[in-house]
Amino acid sequence: MHDYLYLASQSPRRRELLTQLGVRYELLLADDEEDAEALEVVQPGETPDDYVQRVCALKAEAALRRRERRALPDAPILTSDTTVCLGGEILGKPGDGADASAMLKALSGSTHRVLTAVTVVSTLGMHHALSISRVTFRAMTAAEIERYVDSGEPLGKAGAYGIQGRAAEFVERIEGSYSGIMGLPLFETAALLRQARLRF
């Protein structure tokens, strides 16, 4: 049994969600010379489902190498990746305010999918889970989109919004996992952690 895990994620939401589960963790973040962004390039013809699972697994492999390179004690490693897709189009993190505005305009008045993949690596192997949720946004005015983008909240978030923040006012309905939409589906994550023999 393990008493803690390594979290290979910079996301404050994922930290909050792990704490909510009562999981002890240490951060295992990328070194300066690692090109984390290169992992997130969409491959030609790749579906959103395949994309998010591939990126999550690559993050786990990179974190495992990082743990070994730093000669850290053995403990499970958790990685996660979230993507938003509308139709078959992957909406990643916006590059700037104009990019965020375009994404939010596309999401306005429609239903999109939020896919969050989770990978846990332990001595028992590499185990994966995928959470798929549907989110319906009410129609948003151009002024509302502009105000939200000006808040700075959309930057750094897949699909240009965080459901736990100001964007909650645009969410008409969700089907699936609220924590998954935030970035770490707790039901699936807890099952993976039990598989990895983590005490929490």
Curated annotation (Swiss-Prot):
Its cofactor is a divalent metal cation. The keyword Hydrolase applies. It is an enzyme of class 3 (hydrolase). It is found in: Cytoplasm. Its main location: cytoplasm. GO terms for molecular function: dTTP diphosphatase activity; UTP diphosphatase activity. SUPFAM superfamilies: ITPase-like. The active site is at D81. InterPro entries: ITPase-like_fam, Maf-like. Disulfide bonds: none annotated. Nucleoside triphosphate pyrophosphatase that hydrolyzes dTTP and UTP. May have a dual role in cell division arrest and in preventing the incorporation of modified nucleotides into cellular nucleic acids. This is dTTP/UTP pyrophosphatase.
